[in-house]
């Protein structure tokens, strides 16, 4: 994947970059693996805003992704690498030898025509899915399960990667993208390799309209609101926050407060917390 930088022919084009989509080999998705989805614009069933700054955006079809990878000992051929508007990573279309078609997250360097498979006896190569107990230490992995059979939940964004550090009884030590080291059941599955489209984070949208295409609405600063709308609001001119430290719109401290529940049951599985946490 290469980054295209546009000439500043207009203010919106200045500093705008995009992907060249050189890895994409198929434009139209597989119809049997599509589902319609409705956008709620951040509202719940009562019509109340539960997530701010969402709404609009281009209409999208949801691609059904196989995060479980539980078709053991059945080989599949990569037929295409496709764009998925619902995620940052690209997806790969697989044709299994028994006639089943499926989408998976496209790992880095996965090519059309590559044969992939799942199961404890699969080879250690990008795109293959194995239980953590069958993956040697030092191997890069992604799409990691937290509960056996539930499907991958960790390391699914573009360019992310985790690493197997070793086995410890019924658990496997894994270092995540954030630097966190945690225990995961060795019967959980993961896919070999790192997630592709690794230069996604380098893309600059360049203009507000491109953000609106993604379904993201503008965000106003609290300091320009009225005092009944935000703790930072009110005052004459450019007034300071007026509090000991910045606050969220709901009056809670927004800096330096831990958001993780220290009494969570999974806390005992974390060997080392992510970078920045002590």
From Swiss-Prot:
Cleavable signal peptide: none
SUPFAM superfamilies listed in its UniProt record: Nucleic acid-binding proteins, Translation proteins SH3-like domain
SMART domains (UniProt xref): Ribosomal_L2, Ribosomal_L2_C
Segments of skewed composition (Basic residues): 210-219, 252-263
Pfam families per record: Ribosomal_L2 (PF00181), Ribosomal_L2_C (PF03947)
Sequence segments annotated as region (Disordered): 210-278
InterPro entries, sorted: NA-bd_OB-fold, Rib_uL2_dom2, Ribosomal_uL2, Ribosomal_uL2_bac/org-type, Ribosomal_uL2_C, Ribosomal_uL2_CS, Ribosomal_uL2_dom3, Ribosomal_uL2_RNA-bd_dom
Assembly mode: Part of the 50S ribosomal subunit. Forms a bridge to the 30S subunit in the 70S ribosome.
Function of the molecule: One of the primary rRNA binding proteins. Required for association of the 30S and 50S subunits to form the 70S ribosome, for tRNA binding and peptide bond formation. It has been suggested to have peptidyltransferase activity; this is somewhat controversial. Makes several contacts with the 16S rRNA in the 70S ribosome.
Family matches, as HAMAP family: Ribosomal_uL2_B (MF_01320_B)
Protein's name according to its UniProt entry: Large ribosomal subunit protein uL2
High-level lineage: Bacteria, Bacillati, Bacillota, Bacilli, Lactobacillales
GN (gene name): rplB
């Amino acid at each position: 994947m290469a980054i295209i930088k546009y000439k500043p022919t207009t203010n919106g084009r200045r500093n705008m970059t995009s992907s060249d989509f050189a890895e994409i080999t198929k434009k139209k998705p597989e119809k049997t693996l599509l589902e319609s989805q409705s956008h709620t614009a951040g509202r719940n069933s009562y019509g109340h805003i539960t997530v701010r700054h969402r709404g609009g955006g281009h209409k999208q079809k949801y691609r059904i992704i196989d995060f479980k990878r539980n078709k053991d000992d059945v080989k599949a051929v990569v037929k295409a690498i496709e764009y998925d508007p619902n995620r940052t990573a690209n997806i790969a279309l697989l044709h299994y030898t028994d006639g089943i078609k499926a989408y998976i997250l496209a790992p880095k360097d996965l090519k059309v025509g590559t044969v992939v498979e799942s199961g404890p006896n699969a080879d250690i190569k990008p795109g293959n899915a194995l239980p953590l107990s069958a993956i040697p230490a030092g191997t890069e992995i992604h799409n990691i399960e937290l509960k056996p059979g539930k499907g991958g939940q960790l390391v699914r964004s573009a360019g992310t990667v985790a690493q197997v550090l070793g086995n410890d009884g019924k658990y496997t030590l894994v270092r995540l993208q954030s630097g966190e080291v945690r225990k995961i059941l060795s019967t959980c599955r993961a896919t070999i390799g790192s997630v592709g489209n690794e230069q996604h984070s380098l893309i600059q949208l360049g203009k507000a309209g491109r953000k609106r295409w993604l379904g993201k609405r503008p965000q106003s600063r609290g300091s320009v609101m009225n005092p009944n709308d935000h703790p930072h609001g009110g005052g004459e001119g450019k007034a300071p926050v007026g509090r000991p430290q910045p606050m969220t719109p709901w009056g809670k401290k927004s800096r330096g407060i831990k958001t993780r529940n220290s009494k969570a049951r999974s806390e005992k599985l974390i060997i080392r917390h992510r970078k920045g946490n002590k």
